[in-house]
């Protein structure tokens, strides 16, 4: 004899009840329920409206960040030499460096970006020139140069050096970002790697470190 059953769905418990029937002609008394088709339809309609409203909600506007980045370094030393260096970069373009340093002897002075922003032992602890590509020292316009090779700044008769430098190798963001590194102004002129001295290809034979300052981001 084939088995017969009635499948009864209970909306209150969200389960299905199966009642076996040995005799298909036997009347079966189903559990009583307060379920009404109209109520179910109303619930579905409300859910549909909610989902439809969520799907049609307007997307949130994107946040746009400023493309201009700025940084500053305040240079101090053991002597009277001091100064301020500001850096500005537009999007992924070159970085513009504005320099003003006072207390120098008149004439050229080597000006470099050094690898570390560590001044715990004065300017000597800023380490070597920033050189992520492992090149020898050179002039700013040379293809083979340290990224931190920024040439010379020239102090006038009053000991004030002002300069604007535009350079592609000292970005404010990315893997070679200069933030957290240090600018150093030197005692002597940088020979730009061409002086023939044993230090020409490492430091430009620019002499001692007069003042230094760590690069930090500033508000745009």
From Swiss-Prot:
Chief localization: plastid
Residues reported to bind Cu cation: 112, 114, 129, 186
First and last residue of the signal peptide: none
Disulfide bonds: 123-212
GO molecular function annotations of the record: copper ion binding; superoxide dismutase activity
Transit peptide: 1-66
Positions annotated to bind Zn(2+): 129, 137, 146, 149
Role: Destroys radicals which are normally produced within the cells and which are toxic to biological systems.
Name the record gives this protein: Superoxide dismutase [Cu-Zn], chloroplastic
Organism: Solidago canadensis var. scabra (Tall goldenrod)
